[in-house]
Amino acid sequence: MANAEKTSSGSDIDEKKRKRKLSNRESARRSRLKKQKLMEDTIHEISSLERRIKENSERCRAVKQRLDSVETENAGLRSEKIWLSSYVSDLENMIATTSLTLTQSGGGDCVDDQNANAGIAVGDCRRTPWKLSCGSLQPMASFKT
């Protein structure tokens, strides 16, 4: 009987070993599947992030180009503003000089109300085009960058 118990108990041990081995294999298989899924998810996430990086880089490049364009246009407009300010200042100086000259000369080309033959009244001199020597003050052509 002791032999029968050993045999029975030996086969129980073998059965337990076999079940444990099978359980370990199944656990290892689940672990491998879990690891594989994690790897696939990570690869998918990397791919997605790389795509987003590429899109953001392209967007950044487009914004940089637009910024450069706007900065160039802004520099041109600032230059044109300086030129126009100088032009207006020169025109104001010419008007002041011309007004002063007319005042000092007693009216210049304008005639007073008593000279009816000329047909020009006082004050009409401001409506007549002056031929001043200001060749350097030509209007600036449209400025494009």
Swiss-Prot record:
Segments forming domain bZIP: 14-77
Q: Does the keyword Ribonucleoprotein apply?
A: no
Query: Spans of biased composition, class Polar residues?
Result: 1-11
Q: What does the record say about the knockout?
A: Reduced requirement for exogenous sugar for seedling growth and higher rates of true leaf development.
Q: Which family does it belong to?
A: Belongs to the bZIP family.
State whether it acts alone or in a complex, and with which partners, per the record: Interacts with ZFP7, BZIP4, BZIP9, BZIP10, BZIP11, BZIP25, BZIP42, BZIP44, BZIP53, BZIP58 and BZIP63.
Name the record gives this protein: Basic leucine zipper 1
Task: Give the originating organism.
Answer: Arabidopsis thaliana
Its lineage opens with: Eukaryota, Viridiplantae, Streptophyta, Embryophyta, Tracheophyta
Q: Which gene encodes it?
A: BZIP1
